[in-house]
Amino acid sequence: MPLGIGALTSLQTLSKIIIGEANGFKISELKGLMHLQGQISITGLHKVFNAIHAKEVNLQQKKGIRDLEMEWSDVFDDSRNENIEYEVLEGLRPYEKLRSLKILNYMGMKFPNWVGDPSFVCLTQLTLRGCKSCTYLPTLGHLQSLEKLFLESMNGLQRLDSEFLRPINSHDFGFPSLQVLEFRDMQGWEIWSTNGGDKDVSFPCLCEISIINCPKLAEVAIDLIPSLEVLHIEECSVSVLRSLVGVSSSFLELSLKNIKGLTQLHGEVLKHLGSLEHLYVTRCDELRYLWESESEACKILVSLWDLRVKFCKNLVSLGKNEVNLDSDSGICLESVRKVELFNCPKLKSYNCPNGIQNLDIYGCRSITSLTFPTLQDLPSTLKILSICYFDNFEANCLLNKFLSSLGYLSIARVPNLSSFPEGCLVHLTKLIIRGCDNIESIPEKGFGFLPLFCLRYLEINSCKNLKSFPHEHLQNLTSLEELWIRDCPNIDYTFPCVLWPPNLTTLTIGGLKKPMSEWGPQNFPTSLVKLSLYGKNSGVVPFAKSEEDVRNRNNTTSSSFVVPPSLTLLQIHGFMELESVLEELHHLTCLEELLIRSCPKLRDLPEMLLPKLSRLWVDSSSLELRKKCGGRKAKYWPVVSQIPDLDVG
């Protein structure tokens, strides 16, 4: 902090205040700054050893402060004194019209009486974090306007009871306005009990509860909270779930992560979830089934439309009885519209709802099939289909079904895919085929290039045996904006210059069978703004400034890439003999990003373009070029040092 701040008596904005050592900024210097406004953060309060100095700051009279953060060090050692810190915090009572208050790493065993005082009628958000010595909380239920309460890393706190939420008057509600309540990293917390009093005294507006990393919490006995709609539980025991799920019948969202002891959602839990719309289950390693009975789940979860199960390594099936369920039985969660199943390696099958719209399955390597209870084809409602890392999945059977409704199709790392569907993908806007090593061709008729008027994104990537690709129809993709064709070493096409999609804005291409030096002349569309060329150990990238430049070259059959001046990003990767791109790139006056990878002989850059760049990356293979860019005495340093995103050494 600069010296003399305290003399600026008209100062209104001072968002960060750092208390210094003996010769540094002292908290008493804030005494005369009566006009401070808005958000104020005071850090280093552990360096205040005289509570009188804290009281002299007179925060209570600084009426312009609306958001206040008070922070001590997160190191709790012998240099700290809990009694002094209590007195300091007591002396820093703010103005009663405060909107937001954060108290961080305070060492006192208790809080001063002003924390939770009902006179703070405008306080809407309160955060108590890292106050590890605190053994009990003040009565916060008095705060009439409080909407959000965050309690984090209060390791000394073992019990929360009705005193925590007690209202001002016996006939009032505790926390009458609270909407969001979060407990996080409460390592010593064991009991949360509000029972024993009037059943209607607390949380009339509470919508969301989050309990995260509270491993010792075992006893939860709280009153009904009819307004509660969202429940997040993470790194807790299953008893917390069983207790909290019964406090409301209005749950819309339930998120469970790393719940110890959770083997399935038993009937005693399911029966409270009739209104549930979103169910998220993550990293529950003891989970083998989501529920005992598929038919029971169907009867209860009638509103569920978003189901996500991720990283549950022992999950065998969503329903225990589904293991032997006939796919024609018609039993499934018909209301579900969106399903994400990620990295559940033992999951063998999934019975999809007939009305599903979005199906995304990743890394479920044991799945061999997807079934639809009453349909022979994929449902007409399906808009998004993404399947990735399926070792034994019969992809050909699935993808040969009717696909006309799809708007997004992504197939990645599916080794059994050997052919592309022959259905007409008339509504497709995004298509990704990545890492499918057994597919050899994408037939013109089967791919349906001619009707793909809606396609905006096409990626064919890392398909090592792909040979046939209907490149001659690229020019018909009039809506295509982004095209990736990369690392397909058996594609033997040269992409004649007149066949590029006319409205292409992004092109990533390279790593094909024939090096770019043998492609012949290329005239990229004038709409192009991002170009990434992957030479895959090719010699040079044959840039040309214009078509006239191409005609003037001695060998008119040689490769020449005419890059449009509209380009804003250029990436050059894997051109082993490329030495210079000086003249060929001077016309790229709109260029903002230049990325160079694996071009070991490149020694020069288009110097006149460098001042306009916002991003320049040169990797370690281009040793000579890096020397010219790195260091104050380097050739390009005066210019490149001004580039915001620079990586040249």
Q: What is each stretch, according to the model?
A:
Residues 1-649:
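Innate immune receptor modules and recognition interfaces
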